[in-house]
Amino acid sequence: FEEKYYPAVKEMVYRTRLSNGLTVALLPKKEFKEVYGSVTIQFGSVDTLVTEVDGDVKSYPAGIAHFLEHKLFERKDSSDLLSAFTSLGADSNAFTSFTKTSYLFSATDHFLENLELLDELVTSAHFTEDSILREQDIIQQEREMYQDDPDSCLFFSTLANLYPSTPLATDIVGSEESISQINLTNLQENFTRFYKPVNMSLFLVGNFDVERVQDYFERKELKVLDVQEVVREKFVLQDVQQTDSMRMDVSSPKLAIGIRGNREVADAECYRHNILLKLLFAMMFGWTSDRFQKLYES
């Protein structure tokens, strides 16, 4: 493991890339009682258009990344991995964003056993047609819940107006139509394409011994490195829809203002760019700003 010290926060991070392509980062904190682990896959709701090896572009239903996140908790014997984590005294969860899917656990005991479950979660998939149909009903109910949330509707509608006719114009969970189009074949294809170590990263933080983790990976049988790159299609941007409105049952009107950037940001600059935007918007529209007070009072 390569060591890197961050003097500003007085933390030492250990980082390596395994022979199978998985990136591993460790942040030991002896003063913690728990260990927190997360594995992140570079696969989110916007990844619905991919370029095949032969150059053809293949399209998948919106919401497939989120659907796959749900299904991976199901084991071959129809039991679920959430219960397996619970039996070890751990909490487990997962979430899908526009660009990533993350699976996580927190535990005070059985650290390596929980790490094994996390590995199982992202390296094996067991789908059946019947279980997919059941999951469609569950996710449709989740989608309807978001549709009843004014803040969620406001956010996603604003995003859709900024990026019309792109994957960003659809909710992360998908639409009623796209959820019903998700099937066994396209779930298997996306699992094979995106869920490979070279497209994943593991982060562990908490009360653990670095040498013990290193020994765990040295003894573990790793898959062969798959270096085939996932080629994503770039968005074709349309004109911004400048104004829009909707009616919902709320106690007072809500307002959202969206600004679409006009340039690409390098990967290495994304984090800094994000912080700068948050600071800018907090000054312009934060609840302590003059602009916020004027909008609120009007």
Regions found by a protein language model. Give the residues of each.
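His/Glu-rich zincin catalytic helix
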Residues: F1-D80, Q188-F292
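Charge-rich, well-structured scaffold segments of protease-associated domains
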Residues: R17, P28, D80-E229, G261, ...
